[in-house]
């Protein structure tokens, strides 16, 4: 499965090999060489409960760029619901999504796994049509913002993938995916999702 197929899994989920802090810096500041970008470093903060806020049921609105890194300006919209629950006493989070869009109905899932040694999360995605997990993005939360990265190929080109979780409140959250084909100098956002909590289902402490 190539990165476009992997990306399709993410693009249908609201949410992926170790966190690459230098890559994160490149996303904010300037490009780095390939050798510097692949240097790993582990987080030190205990982030086991970072995804507790996400537990519950949500209304989900998704916008997906039709053809990433092609200067495409065509966006496709989806709407659905997302259910999130804890497993492994909070060291893993299981997300299940159902949504509808121009291509019809789909079902997907994300398994978020916490590594107690590196203090980082891996975000693993799949959908019911493939039955396989895509390449995970791995990272952590800092100051209320989650950043997760991986390195893949798209149409024969090496790219970086960045997945950001931000604007977190008790009742809403934003997810954003972007690709870079220039070593992290610039990023093109190709997927945006906003979740709004469904209060009558169950609350964040469930």
Name each region found by the language model.
Residues 1-9:
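N-terminal secretory signal peptides that target proteins for export/translocation
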Residues 10-22:
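Bacterial N-terminal signal peptides
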Residues 26-206:
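Hydrophobic small-molecule pocket/channel-lining residues, especially in calycin-type beta-barrels
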